[in-house]
Amino acid sequence: KGLDLYTYTNVTGVRLDGEKRVQGVDTDKGFIPCGKVVNACGVWSPEIGRMAGLEIPVEPRKGVILVSAPSFKFCNQKVQEFGYMISKFSNHECKRDPELEKYEVSFVIEPTDANNVLIGSSRNFAGYDISTEMEIIHVIAKRAIRFYPILKDLNCIRTYAGLRPFLADHLPLITQVDEVPGYYIATGHEGDGISMAPTTGRLISELIAGE
């Protein structure tokens, strides 16, 4: 049957009946009746969860990326240091430079089709703030130059930040909610949401279909 896609539509509430069964979703463009709701809202999943009386322990974990000016192709694939996994899992048993520890900085580089490179990355908790602090930029740049000295000769043309949906056990939350029949959750993938999307979609579809 296909689907209807509602773009630029804000969810304002999840309607439940007296037995807490899902009845539909309220939006700023009207009510959408449905018996199943999947909360796959990443860092905003706690807000949508509260609409159904649920507390979802996801926190936004910020990451900053630097973008270089175009250059000759000195990097043809994504490269990351092993410390990336140490930062991701907040393993403080492995002692590193204090400035790396402060913002969980580890080196990762990825080329683009336009011969820019994306350079990261950091991990810190700053709520929903997506500003890029100069201190973090300097730490990322310093770490990157240690691995690729050529980077010191490139200009950084911009920076940006994103938010990862973090859970304390570092495992995604993919489940149906027995207390609220018809409510499903798929969140907490942190930085692995794209790579885990196919499996997550399959698991959620099987839960909904009762397979």
Predicted regions and their residues:
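Core beta-strand elements of the Rossmann-like FAD/NAD(P) dinucleotide-binding domain
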Residues: Y6, D26-K36
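Helix-loop-beta segment of a Rossmann-like dinucleotide-binding subdomain
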Residues: K1, V22-G24, S122-A126, P181, ...
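Alpha-helix N-cap/helix-start capping motif
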Residues: T9, G42-V43, P198
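General beta-strand structural signal in soluble alpha/beta enzymes
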Residues: Y6-T7, N39, I119, I185
